[in-house]
C-alpha cells in the first residue's frame, strides 16, 4: 500500500476511545506524494460520540419548571444521573469577582473531603470555571473540582461574562462524563432556583460557599442532541 490509512484510523480510534472512555468520531485529511510514495495524515478533530443507547425517551420540556432546581438550554453532556445528593454553590449576596481566588481555595478544600469519602456533588457558581483570569471566573484547576459530576456557570445580573461552555476542562468533562450547564436566569435563559438551596441547612458553610445535602438523590437528565439539561428533586 502507498499509505496505510486503515491502520492509522484504527489506531486513532483505539487511542481516542481509551482516553475519552467512549466511542469517538474523527475528522481528518491526508496529503499523498505519488512520487515519493508516502503521505501525511492530519487529525483535524476528535470528539466523543453521543451514546444512542442513552437516548432520552421523554421530552424534558414537559417537566414543570416549579419542580426544577437547574435548567440549561446550552449545555454539554448526555445521560441520566440519579445518585447525587450534594450541592456546593457560591453565595451570590455581596458576590464580587475580587474574591474568586479565595473561593477557589475554599472549593478545593471541600472537594478533598468528597474525594476522601468517594462521593460526588453538583457545583454551581458565576463566571467561567477554570479561567486563568480571576476577574472572569473562579480560577480552579481540574484537581480542585474533580469530584463534581455537574458543573454550572450561573450568570448574575451584576456579573455578566461570556460563557466558556466548558472549554477549560473539555477533555476532562468528556472523559469522565461530567455535565456542564450554562445558565443566565436573569435573562430568562434557563433556571437556577437558588432559593431552594438557601433554605436547606448547610452541611458546611464558609464565607463564600455553601454545601447542602438533599434527603433523596437529585435527578439529572441531559439531552446532548438538544443541549438541554435539567436537574430536579426526587418526588
Residue ranges and their predicted role:
Residues 232-235:
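Conserved small/polar residues in nucleotide/adenosyl-binding loops
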Amino acid at each position: 500500500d502507498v499509505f496505510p490509512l486503515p491502520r492509522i484510523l484504527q489506531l486513532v480510534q483505539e487511542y481516542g476511545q481509551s482516553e475519552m472512555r467512549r466511542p469517538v468520531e474523527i475528522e481528518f485529511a491526508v496529503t499523498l506524494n505519488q512520487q515519493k510514495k508516502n503521505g501525511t495524515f492530519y487529525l483535524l478533530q476528535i470528539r466523543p460520540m453521543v451514546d444512542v443507547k442513552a437516548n432520552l425517551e421523554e421530552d424534558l420540556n414537559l417537566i414543570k419548571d416549579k419542580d426544577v432546581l437547574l435548567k440549561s438550554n446550552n449545555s454539554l453532556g448526555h445521560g441520566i444521573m440519579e445518585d447525587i445528593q450534594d450541592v456546593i454553590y457560591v453565595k451570590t449576596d455581596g458576590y464580587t469577582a475580587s474574591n474568586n481566588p479565595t473561593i477557589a481555595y475554599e472549593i478545593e478544600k471541600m472537594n478533598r473531603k468528597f474525594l476522601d469519602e468517594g462521593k460526588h456533588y453538583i457545583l454551581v457558581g458565576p463566571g467561567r470555571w477554570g479561567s486563568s483570569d480571576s476577574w472572569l471566573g473562579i480560577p480552579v484547576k481540574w484537581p480542585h473540582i474533580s469530584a463534581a459530576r455537574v458543573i454550572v456557570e450561573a450568570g448574575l445580573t451584576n456579573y455578566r461574562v461570556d460563557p466558556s461552555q466548558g472549554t477549560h476542562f473539555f477533555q476532562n468533562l468528556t472523559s469522565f462524563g461530567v455535565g456542564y450547564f450554562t445558565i443566565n436566569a436573569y435573562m430568562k435563559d434557563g433556571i437556577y432556583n437558588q432559593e431552594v438551596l438557601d433554605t436547606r441547612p448547610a452541611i458546611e458553610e464558609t464565607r463564600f460557599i455553601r454545601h447542602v445535602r438533599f434527603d433523596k438523590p437529585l435527578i439529572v437528565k441531559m439531552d446532548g442532541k438538544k443541549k438541554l439539561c435539567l436537574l430536579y428533586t426526587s418526588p
